[in-house]
């Protein structure tokens, strides 16, 4: 629903042009050798069923999986997702349907499945700052604070390597902010956001390791921030 995307007749703006969705999905499906998936919202507004129309059109054009976010385009990122609005799409689809929106832990995943009748869930922003949530959803034990810091360092390395230093440093700020918010450390967020190159970011993370471990011991045991 981002304005810069919708201005280009892309993203959720396509819900106003179901025929164009069909053409795009058909073109992609005929051009690749892997299954094609489509993600949509429930509609342009809460009063229409454009999401269901888009899902069915995408299926008929060759999509093998549909993901539906429980908000309308008009809702943008406000309010709450409405997983129950996925039932109509589920009843008309032959391919799997995944529920998306406001899924941040096991309880919200179970809620989305129960209310939507979907075949599964897809996490988006709920995984920001806690990539280990997938292990938790599968019933596995969570990594220790030390292991989480190692994962954060690996993620930082990967962003610099994949995007290059200029873009990697910029993108790392967003992800590190998500990590640090979950650890309840606003002062550390401000410090990290001021760093201007990859070397500074690496050095900062190394220098703050012990401080972050001490903070984690409090945050995770007191339940102040979602683990």
Regions found by a protein language model. Name each.
Residues 3-21, 71-83, 141-143:
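Glycine-rich tight-turn/loop motif centered on a GG-T
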Residues 23-26, 31-33, 47-65, 77, ...:
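Alpha/beta catalytic cores of nucleotide-metabolism and tRNA/nucleoside-modifying enzymes
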């Amino acid at each position: 629903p981002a304005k810069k995307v919708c201005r280009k007749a892309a993203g959720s703006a396509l819900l106003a042009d179901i025929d164009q969705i069909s053409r795009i999905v058909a073109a992609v499906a005929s051009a690749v050798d892997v299954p094609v998936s489509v993600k949509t919202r429930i509609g342009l507004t809460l009063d229409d069923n454009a999401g269901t129309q888009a899902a069915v059109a995408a299926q008929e054009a060759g999509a093998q999986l549909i993901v539906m976010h429980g908000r309308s385009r008009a809702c943008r990122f406000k309010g709450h997702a409405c997983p129950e609005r996925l039932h109509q799409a589920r009843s008309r689809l032959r391919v799997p349907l995944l529920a998306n929106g406001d899924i941040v832990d096991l309880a919200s995943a179970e809620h989305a499945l129960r209310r939507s009748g979907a075949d599964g869930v897809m996490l988006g922003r709920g995984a920001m700052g806690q990539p280990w949530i997938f292990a938790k959803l599968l019933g596995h034990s969570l990594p220790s604070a030390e292991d989480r810091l190692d994962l954060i360092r690996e993620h930082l390395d990967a962003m610099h390597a994949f995007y290059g230093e200029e873009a990697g440093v910029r993108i790392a700020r967003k992800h590190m902010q998500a990590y640090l918010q979950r650890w309840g450390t606003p002062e550390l967020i401000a410090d990290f956001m001021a760093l201007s190159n990859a070397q500074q970011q690496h050095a900062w993370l190394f220098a703050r390791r012990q401080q972050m471990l001490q903070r984690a011991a409090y945050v995770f045991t007191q339940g102040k921030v979602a683990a």
